[in-house]
Amino acid sequence: NKGFSLEELIAAGVALKSERGPGIYDRFRDRLLFPIFDVQDRAVGFGGRTLDPNAKEAKYINSPQTAIYNKSFVLYNLNQAKSFIKDSGYAVVVEGYMDVISSWQAGIKNIVAVSGTALVSETNYSKEEGSGFKYEQVKLLKRYCNEIRLCFDADLAGQSASERGIDLALAAELEVKIVALSQGKDPDEAARMNLVKFKQEIEQALPIGEYAFKSVFKKVDVKTREGKKQAAKFLLAAIAKLPDPVERDFYIKRLARDLDVEEKSLRESLPNPPKPRTNAIGKVNCLVN
C-alpha cells in the first residue's frame, strides 16, 4: 500500500471496507483506470471501466467525493486541453473518457468530458446517477473560452444532457452550439468511423435555434394540425430561452412562415423570455432549474 494506512486509502476513495471481515478491497478491481486531474495537473480521482463484458456491475464508476475530488468542479482532460481551448476560442464538451481519448488521438485537442457518473452507494455499483453538465463546470470553462460546442451521445440521455447543457451555458453567458452526429452512437464511435466527417460536424456545429428547428422538422409532420401544435410548443420553448430579443424575433417570424400560422398567435403562446442576467458568473440565474 506504499506506506498509506487503511483509513487513508478509504478516505482517498480507492479502497472500500470489506463486508466479509476485517480489511479492505480495491474499489476499482478488474477495471481499466482513467486518472482524473484538476486544472493544475494534480491527480484527484479515477474513473474505472469494467473489463468484463458480462459483468453485472456498472460499466463505469468514478471515485466518490473526497477531500480533494468533487466531480462538479472537474472536467476530464481540461488540464491538457485548456491551451488548445484558448487558441481555438471554444471547447468541445463530450460525456465520457473514451470520447475524449478517441478525439484527442485524432487531433481534436480542445475537448473535455463531463464524466459525470457517480455512485449512489459505495458498495452497490449497479445504482448510478446520470451523467450531466454542472454549472460549476461551465464556470470553469468560461475561464478559457466564450463558446462551447456540446457533443453528447445520440440517445435520449444524451439529448437530455444537451438540453441541460444549453441552459447552463446560457446562464453563464456563453455562446453554445450543438454538434449533430450523423454517424455512430457517440463521439468515440463517430471519430473512429469517419474522422473527416466528425471534424466537419464539429466545425459546422449549429446554433441552438438552428439545431432546434432542424430536429423538430425532421421528426414532426408539420402538415397536420397536431404536428403544427407539437412543433410550435417545442420550438417556442426553445426560442424563449434565447437571451437576445432580436434573435427571438427572427425565429418567431421564421416559425410562423414555416408552419403557415399567424405570427401573432405564436407571440401570444411564447413563454416568458429569460430575465436579464447578472454579469456575476458566480450567480445562478433564472435559466437554471
Where are these regions (language model features)?
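A charged alpha-helical hairpin associated with nucleic-acid processing machineries
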Residues: 38-39, 82-89, 105, 127-289
